[in-house]
Amino acid sequence: EIRQPNGELHIPHIATAARELLDAGVRQRVVIHCPEGAWGEAPDLPGVWIPSQYLAQEEIVGSVGAGDAFCAGFLYGCHERWSLTDSVRLAHACARASLLCANAIDGAKTLAELKAEMVDA
């Protein structure tokens, strides 16, 4: 379970799941994400928790495409050989942009705009 009975995240369980995926044969990077943040790990790097920027429920306009936006941002960072942490930060920025719009298209921003939204952990 990634959540404790009180609803809070159980980050050690998330870390264990990521390590199990690596041990099962994932050769590059594993990222497990949820609204609060993402755990990232690679065979040659220790795991790290990278929190997302908080959005109040009333700020969220729509959630269609937010998970896909997260994945797209992460994959872009990987393709461009960004660090694991920066790839996840870009993924968070992409998901946040999507959540602030009513549909999956209006949240699309330029890379420069997304970089400005990347939050240091």
Task: Please identify what each model-predicted range represents.
Residues 2-121:
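Conserved phosphate-binding/catalytic region of the ribokinase-like
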